[in-house]
Amino acid sequence: MGKEKETRNYSRRYKSEYNIFRSIFFMIFLWVVVNPVTFFMYKLKVKGKNNLPKKGNYILAPNHVSEMDPPFVASAVNKHIAFMAKKELFDKSDKRHDLIHLLGAFSVDREKPEIATFKTVKDIFQTNWPLGIFPEGGTKKNKKIEDIRKGFVVIAKHAKADIIPISIVGFDGYAKKLFEKDITVVIGEPISYKLDADEIIQKWCAEICKNTGFENCMLNKEEKVEV
Protein backbone atom coordinates (compact mmCIF):
# COMPACT_ATOMS: atom_id res chain seq x y z
CA MET A 1 0.00 0.00 0.00
CA GLY A 2 2.84 2.38 0.83
CA LYS A 3 4.48 2.03 -2.57
CA GLU A 4 1.18 2.38 -4.39
CA LYS A 5 0.41 5.56 -2.49
CA GLU A 6 3.89 6.96 -3.21
CA THR A 7 3.53 6.27 -6.93
CA ARG A 8 0.11 7.94 -7.04
CA ASN A 9 1.45 11.00 -5.28
CA TYR A 10 4.35 11.31 -7.68
CA SER A 11 2.15 10.82 -10.75
CA ARG A 12 -0.25 13.68 -10.04
CA ARG A 13 1.07 17.22 -10.23
CA TYR A 14 -0.73 20.52 -10.58
CA LYS A 15 -0.42 23.72 -12.58
CA SER A 16 0.47 25.68 -9.45
CA GLU A 17 3.59 23.54 -8.97
CA TYR A 18 5.09 24.74 -12.27
CA ASN A 19 5.40 28.30 -11.10
CA ILE A 20 8.04 30.98 -11.53
CA PHE A 21 10.00 29.73 -8.51
CA ARG A 22 10.33 26.19 -9.86
CA SER A 23 11.23 27.59 -13.28
CA ILE A 24 13.99 29.71 -11.75
CA PHE A 25 15.27 26.79 -9.67
CA PHE A 26 15.35 24.54 -12.75
CA MET A 27 17.30 27.10 -14.80
CA ILE A 28 19.78 27.85 -12.01
CA PHE A 29 20.38 24.12 -11.55
CA LEU A 30 20.79 23.79 -15.33
CA TRP A 31 23.30 26.62 -15.65
CA VAL A 32 25.29 25.97 -12.47
CA VAL A 33 25.31 22.17 -12.25
CA VAL A 34 24.25 20.60 -15.55
CA ASN A 35 25.76 22.80 -18.27
CA PRO A 36 29.34 22.70 -16.93
CA VAL A 37 29.17 18.90 -17.12
CA THR A 38 27.48 18.57 -20.51
CA PHE A 39 29.52 21.24 -22.27
CA PHE A 40 32.93 20.78 -20.65
CA MET A 41 33.04 17.02 -20.06
CA TYR A 42 30.93 15.88 -23.01
CA LYS A 43 31.63 18.81 -25.38
CA LEU A 44 27.92 18.94 -26.18
CA LYS A 45 26.96 20.20 -29.63
CA VAL A 46 23.40 21.04 -30.67
CA LYS A 47 21.89 20.84 -34.16
CA GLY A 48 18.40 21.80 -35.32
CA LYS A 49 17.51 24.14 -32.49
CA ASN A 50 15.43 26.15 -34.96
CA ASN A 51 13.02 23.17 -35.04
CA LEU A 52 11.81 23.98 -31.52
CA PRO A 53 8.35 25.59 -31.66
CA LYS A 54 8.24 29.23 -30.65
CA LYS A 55 4.86 28.74 -28.96
CA GLY A 56 2.25 26.09 -28.23
CA ASN A 57 2.42 22.72 -26.53
CA TYR A 58 4.96 20.13 -27.58
CA ILE A 59 6.61 16.94 -26.39
CA LEU A 60 10.38 16.40 -26.47
CA ALA A 61 10.97 12.74 -27.32
CA PRO A 62 14.64 11.64 -27.17
CA ASN A 63 16.19 8.22 -27.62
CA HIS A 64 17.50 6.81 -24.36
CA VAL A 65 21.11 5.62 -24.14
CA SER A 66 22.17 6.66 -20.63
CA GLU A 67 21.16 8.39 -17.41
CA MET A 68 22.81 11.53 -18.82
CA ASP A 69 20.06 11.91 -21.43
CA PRO A 70 17.82 14.29 -19.45
CA PRO A 71 20.78 16.64 -18.78
CA PHE A 72 21.82 16.45 -22.46
CA VAL A 73 18.31 17.38 -23.59
CA ALA A 74 17.86 20.16 -21.04
CA SER A 75 21.21 21.70 -22.01
CA ALA A 76 20.37 21.42 -25.71
CA VAL A 77 17.01 23.19 -25.50
CA ASN A 78 18.08 25.51 -22.65
CA LYS A 79 14.63 25.41 -21.13
CA HIS A 80 12.86 23.91 -18.16
CA ILE A 81 11.29 20.54 -18.99
CA ALA A 82 8.73 18.43 -17.13
CA PHE A 83 10.15 14.95 -17.63
CA MET A 84 8.03 11.86 -17.32
CA ALA A 85 9.99 9.31 -15.30
CA LYS A 86 9.18 5.62 -15.19
CA LYS A 87 7.18 4.74 -12.11
CA GLU A 88 9.82 2.25 -10.95
CA LEU A 89 12.22 5.14 -10.29
CA PHE A 90 9.83 6.58 -7.72
CA ASP A 91 9.38 3.17 -6.09
CA LYS A 92 13.07 3.03 -5.22
CA SER A 93 14.29 4.29 -1.88
CA ASP A 94 17.08 6.41 -3.30
CA LYS A 95 17.65 10.14 -3.40
CA ARG A 96 17.24 10.65 -7.15
CA HIS A 97 13.46 10.83 -7.12
CA ASP A 98 13.53 13.70 -4.61
CA LEU A 99 15.75 15.78 -6.89
CA ILE A 100 13.95 15.04 -10.14
CA HIS A 101 10.60 15.63 -8.46
CA LEU A 102 11.89 18.99 -7.27
CA LEU A 103 12.94 19.72 -10.87
CA GLY A 104 9.40 19.06 -12.13
CA ALA A 105 9.43 15.37 -13.09
CA PHE A 106 6.53 13.05 -12.35
CA SER A 107 5.86 9.32 -12.35
CA VAL A 108 4.18 7.56 -15.28
CA ASP A 109 3.31 4.09 -16.52
CA ARG A 110 4.39 4.54 -20.15
CA GLU A 111 2.67 1.35 -21.30
CA LYS A 112 -0.69 2.26 -19.80
CA PRO A 113 -0.93 5.90 -18.68
CA GLU A 114 -3.33 6.51 -15.81
CA ILE A 115 -6.00 9.21 -15.58
CA ALA A 116 -3.70 11.09 -13.19
CA THR A 117 -1.10 11.24 -15.96
CA PHE A 118 -3.44 12.96 -18.40
CA LYS A 119 -4.58 15.41 -15.71
CA THR A 120 -0.96 16.24 -14.93
CA VAL A 121 -0.14 16.73 -18.62
CA LYS A 122 -3.17 19.00 -19.01
CA ASP A 123 -2.03 21.10 -16.06
CA ILE A 124 1.56 21.30 -17.30
CA PHE A 125 0.46 22.43 -20.75
CA GLN A 126 -1.36 25.36 -19.16
CA THR A 127 2.11 26.65 -18.29
CA ASN A 128 5.09 27.26 -20.57
CA TRP A 129 6.80 23.97 -19.67
CA PRO A 130 7.27 21.43 -22.48
CA LEU A 131 6.96 17.73 -21.72
CA GLY A 132 9.88 15.29 -21.90
CA ILE A 133 9.14 11.63 -22.69
CA PHE A 134 11.50 8.77 -23.56
CA PRO A 135 9.51 6.52 -25.95
CA GLU A 136 11.86 3.57 -25.33
CA GLY A 137 10.85 3.51 -21.67
CA GLY A 138 14.38 2.83 -20.42
CA THR A 139 18.01 3.00 -21.45
CA LYS A 140 19.04 0.86 -24.43
CA LYS A 141 22.66 -0.08 -25.05
CA ASN A 142 22.33 -2.37 -28.08
CA LYS A 143 22.19 0.38 -30.74
CA LYS A 144 18.74 -0.74 -31.84
CA ILE A 145 15.42 1.07 -31.81
CA GLU A 146 12.87 -1.51 -30.72
CA ASP A 147 10.00 -2.11 -28.31
CA ILE A 148 8.81 1.49 -28.38
CA ARG A 149 6.35 2.31 -25.60
CA LYS A 150 3.12 3.48 -27.22
CA GLY A 151 2.13 5.69 -24.30
CA PHE A 152 3.87 8.77 -25.71
CA VAL A 153 1.58 8.68 -28.76
CA VAL A 154 -1.54 8.34 -26.61
CA ILE A 155 -0.44 11.29 -24.50
CA ALA A 156 0.41 13.42 -27.55
CA LYS A 157 -2.99 12.83 -29.10
CA HIS A 158 -4.90 13.52 -25.90
CA ALA A 159 -2.91 16.70 -25.29
CA LYS A 160 -2.96 17.71 -28.98
CA ALA A 161 0.78 18.28 -28.76
CA ASP A 162 3.27 17.73 -31.58
CA ILE A 163 6.28 15.51 -30.93
CA ILE A 164 9.85 16.76 -31.33
CA PRO A 165 12.19 13.82 -32.03
CA ILE A 166 15.56 14.32 -30.36
CA SER A 167 18.58 12.19 -31.26
CA ILE A 168 21.38 11.77 -28.74
CA VAL A 169 24.42 10.86 -30.79
CA GLY A 170 27.88 9.62 -29.81
CA PHE A 171 27.45 8.31 -26.27
CA ASP A 172 29.96 5.52 -25.58
CA GLY A 173 30.40 5.79 -21.84
CA TYR A 174 30.43 8.27 -18.98
CA ALA A 175 33.05 11.03 -18.97
CA LYS A 176 35.48 11.09 -16.05
CA LYS A 177 37.47 14.18 -17.01
CA LEU A 178 37.18 17.41 -18.98
CA PHE A 179 36.69 17.28 -22.75
CA GLU A 180 36.76 13.48 -22.78
CA LYS A 181 33.60 12.76 -24.79
CA ASP A 182 31.79 14.17 -27.82
CA ILE A 183 28.00 14.26 -27.73
CA THR A 184 25.69 15.76 -30.34
CA VAL A 185 22.00 16.42 -29.78
CA VAL A 186 19.98 16.67 -32.99
CA ILE A 187 16.57 18.32 -32.67
CA GLY A 188 14.30 17.08 -35.46
CA GLU A 189 11.30 18.63 -37.15
CA PRO A 190 7.98 18.33 -35.29
CA ILE A 191 5.84 15.25 -35.89
CA SER A 192 2.15 16.16 -35.96
CA TYR A 193 -0.06 14.51 -33.36
CA LYS A 194 -2.78 14.42 -36.05
CA LEU A 195 -1.02 11.61 -37.93
CA ASP A 196 -1.99 7.98 -37.45
CA ALA A 197 -0.39 6.49 -34.36
CA ASP A 198 1.64 3.99 -36.37
CA GLU A 199 2.94 6.73 -38.65
CA ILE A 200 4.03 8.81 -35.66
CA ILE A 201 6.02 5.88 -34.28
CA GLN A 202 7.58 5.12 -37.67
CA LYS A 203 8.58 8.76 -38.22
CA TRP A 204 10.13 8.99 -34.78
CA CYS A 205 12.10 5.78 -35.26
CA ALA A 206 13.28 6.81 -38.73
CA GLU A 207 14.51 10.19 -37.48
CA ILE A 208 16.42 8.71 -34.56
CA CYS A 209 18.01 5.98 -36.67
CA LYS A 210 18.97 8.45 -39.41
CA ASN A 211 20.98 10.52 -36.94
CA THR A 212 22.38 7.81 -34.68
CA GLY A 213 22.97 5.01 -37.20
CA PHE A 214 21.05 2.63 -34.95
CA GLU A 215 19.19 -0.34 -36.42
CA ASN A 216 15.47 0.33 -36.88
CA CYS A 217 13.77 -2.81 -35.59
CA MET A 218 10.38 -1.07 -35.70
CA LEU A 219 10.43 -0.71 -39.48
CA ASN A 220 6.98 -1.49 -40.88
CA LYS A 221 5.95 -2.89 -37.52
CA GLU A 222 2.37 -1.90 -36.72
CA GLU A 223 1.46 -0.74 -33.24
CA LYS A 224 -2.14 -0.89 -32.09
CA VAL A 225 -2.72 2.24 -30.07
CA GLU A 226 -5.96 3.04 -28.28
CA VAL A 227 -6.63 6.76 -27.95
Q: Where are the regions a protein language model picked out?
A:
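Short acidic-hydrophobic, aromatic-tinged amphipathic segments that line or gate anion-handling sites
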Residues: 46-47, 106-109, 193
